């Protein structure tokens, strides 16, 4: 179930202020954020936002197709290292 239209999309206040400040200054430097739950808005297009994945910040370049999605969707938190292989010559 999605968020109520009456409430509007969630975006962290600090992130919104940083994006708006960069838009007024015509600056496109990387913005670091821990807010994975923030929704991508049209005013973020063209910005690079470094989203925290629990260990490091992963840079995400915002495009038009990402609008409406959450920042956390583009910064995976788990690494898949493959299934464990059976030992050679092991008896079952």
Swiss-Prot record:
Which Gene3D superfamilies does its entry note? 30s Ribosomal Protein S19, Chain A (3.30.860.10)
Which SUPFAM superfamilies does the record associate with it? Ribosomal protein S19
Q: Mark the transmembrane ranges.
A: none
GO molecular function ontology, one term from the record: structural constituent of ribosome
Q: Which InterPro entries match?
A: Ribosomal_uS19, Ribosomal_uS19_bac-type, Ribosomal_uS19_CS, Ribosomal_uS19_SF
Q: Which Pfam families match?
A: Ribosomal_S19
GO CC annotations, alphabetized:
cytoplasm; small ribosomal subunit
- Keyword tRNA processing among UniProt keywords: no
**Lineage top rank: taxon:** Bacteria
Keyword Transcription included in the entry's annotation? no
Q: Which GO terms describe its biological process?
A: ribosomal small subunit assembly; translation
Q: Which UniProt keywords apply?
A: Ribonucleoprotein, Ribosomal protein, RNA-binding, rRNA-binding
State the function annotated in the UniProt record.
Protein S19 forms a complex with S13 that binds strongly to the 16S ribosomal RNA.
What does the sequence similarity comment in the record state about its family?
Belongs to the universal ribosomal protein uS19 family.
The record ties this protein, via PANTHER family, to:
RIBOSOMAL PROTEIN S19P FAMILY MEMBER (PTHR11880), SMALL RIBOSOMAL SUBUNIT PROTEIN US19M (PTHR11880:SF8)
Q: What is this protein called?
A: Small ribosomal subunit protein uS19
What organism is the protein native to? Answer: Prochlorococcus marinus (strain MIT 9312)
């Amino acid at each position: 179930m999605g968020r109520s239209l009456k409430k509007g999309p969630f975006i962290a206040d600090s992130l919104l202020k940083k994006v708006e400040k960069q838009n007024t200054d015509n600056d496109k430097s990387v913005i670091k954020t821990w807010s994975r739950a923030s929704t991508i808005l049209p005013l973020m297009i063209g910005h690079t936002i470094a989203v925290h994945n629990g260990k490091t910040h992963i840079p995400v370049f915002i495009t038009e197709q990402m609008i409406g999605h959450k920042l956390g969707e583009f910064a995976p938190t788990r690494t898949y290292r493959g299934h464990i292989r059976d030992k050679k010559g092991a008896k079952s």
